[in-house]
Amino acid sequence: MNNSENNATPWLFEITPKNKFFSLNLTEVWQYRDLLLLFVKRDIVTVYKQTVLGPLWYLIQPLFTAITFTIIFNNLAGINTGTVPPFLFNLAGITVWNYFTACLMGTSNTFGANAGIFGKVYFPRIIVPISIVISNLLKFGIQFGIFIAFYVFYYFQGAAISLNGLVVFFPLLIIVMGILGLGLGMFISSLVTKYRDFSHLIGFGVQLLMYVSAVVYPMALVKEKMPEYAWLVQYNPLAYIIETTRYMLLNVGHISFWGL
């Protein structure tokens, strides 16, 4: 009887979330914009602090990756990129892919890496992952500048490359990539706080995801060579974004509004 009476006793206080799960108070984020800028500056300064080459690593990583992919996938495996130079083809995909992975990897450990700050002072928690996405725009801008430099070089070398008229919408693709990295990274971060195994799987999973995201090959090649596995790429929104990037910047491939 006593147990049933205790269970029936109503709570004096009930703590409930102020907003719904998917509700974002962007007005509050704007009110803390100065703090957001401080986090952005922190992310930029601390990445390569006390390193010899510093920001040059922004250039080294995509260049050597593009060279390696060109040797392995184009020269050895014989993947055809049409009239576009293989190095430029790979560099276009790698530049956009690097921005996504930087946002994903940076936000996937948000709650764990900033637990001390979260417990000391109140501010909108969404500010930290947003600052990571914004700071990675600087890295993307530098790498995209390298792509433009090689684009101009190949153009004056007589390569059959040209911009597509839809290139004006290219910034929207970058915004979409940032949002995807932010959303998926925050979801993984919430899992990592409870299941530590995810922290070991995220790097391996990103590597596997790259190979089904059409970073180093055209999507049409999968349908031609391995049609039974084409669904792995066709149902991957990242593959359509990267394919659309090459369509806009190199005028090669195709664009699928359904995939986007």
Functional labels for PLM-detected ranges:
Residues 1-260:
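Hydrophobic transmembrane alpha-helices and immediately adjacent juxtamembrane helices
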